[in-house]
């Protein structure tokens, strides 16, 4: 079959269980596509062909013996921030260019236990700090919809791989929008779960109180299948929450859009820099949800102006602490011929970290320094609580909150030169991480240049099933999620 890459996760699972095709055939199909198409997209950092075929053969044996799970034999790609035993894990940085993890991240462990086949590791912004996937040490990834544009970030490789049909779905992480924004830029569905829903064990840390892993795929249904595998408590992660996990696939029709109250924050639709096409597509999608029976309720989120300064104090502060472990001594990049220990530290870090990482470490170290700790970091944590309370107050009157996932569509590679401008572009996504809430991106159309636009729905704590269900029903009534970039239509 030449069009296996066009099948949904459900269709792939059915095809494998009914022996219409084998996991080896499916895996070989994707590996051929990667070999032919990825040199243009540059989504993969490492392709694990031999391991993938071994895993596919094991999956076929399990399917034959009747020992399969719902997803046995289906391939996926992992963001290169998840530790993978015996496979290079670089986090997009020269600092970890030769790091091979001795263990699997819990998310990777769970996908293996479910019989999923690892195609490889995909590109990302260095240490997940960025929203373009240009800061990666191995170079930029291209957006399959327009190869001279960025796919978003930091999970840009995950988004590009799925959008180019080089993987049926992928894992991502989201610290300030790193699943939702690239999903928006590449026309995909991406879910950022509640903080503590998915284990962070084995994810290379950026900002520990903000990082969360989640699925990226074409549809809410496809995301639900992966959530069923990766969600749940993990004793190895102290921030993982002991809470019963929903069957996200079974609950896809569990929330009725009829009577659903969708909050429309006044402040969100008056943000400077909100593109007219993005605003129009988001408003059209809300009108569609209204036609399906939802009620739109105007709400106030008065802390909106505080999002960016609060986030860009807390996230860099946590990053400067987390990244202090990379010193050229135990592992990671080590400079050549250091004059002394201080020279080893200085040069290993200045040569091993890229400019954006160094910028955020400097901001974070400054915010945590003795004279400024109370004025900056402590104050930012207090404002963070106010942002959380702002959302909780809104949820007293609405079920979900709607917003664009990004103020613009994807921009050209090399165009994002001003870091402050880039930080301001995170306005719609970062508050969700500050508050620890779940949120989802759904594709809702295109701008005048045929670049995808995304709608973001933000839910209350533990409402992943509700968000997936709403988007699933929206996708039953629209076809934006089925649209494919021209490069994805190519056959290997």
Swiss-Prot record:
Residues forming the catalytic site: 79 (charge relay system), 154 (charge relay system), 178 (acyl-ester intermediate)
One GO cellular component, as annotated: glutamyl-tRNA(Gln) amidotransferase complex
Keyword Magnesium in record: no
UniProt keyword terms in alphabetical order: ATP-binding, Ligase, Nucleotide-binding, Protein biosynthesis
GO annotation terms (biological process): translation
Stored InterPro entries: Amidase, Amidase_CS, Amidase_dom, AS_sf, GatA
Catalytic activity, reaction form: L-glutamyl-tRNA(Gln) + L-glutamine + ATP + H2O = L-glutaminyl-tRNA(Gln) + L-glutamate + ADP + phosphate + H(+)
Function: Allows the formation of correctly charged Gln-tRNA(Gln) through the transamidation of misacylated Glu-tRNA(Gln) in organisms which lack glutaminyl-tRNA synthetase. The reaction takes place in the presence of glutamine and ATP through an activated gamma-phospho-Glu-tRNA(Gln).
Family membership: Belongs to the amidase family. GatA subfamily.
Subunit (UniProt): Heterotrimer of A, B and C subunits.
UniProt xrefs under NCBIfam families: gatA
Protein name as catalogued: Glutamyl-tRNA(Gln) amidotransferase subunit A
Organism of origin: Acinetobacter baumannii (strain ATCC 17978 / DSM 105126 / CIP 53.77 / LMG 1025 / NCDC KC755 / 5377)
Lineage of the species this protein comes from: Bacteria, Pseudomonadati, Pseudomonadota, Gammaproteobacteria, Moraxellales
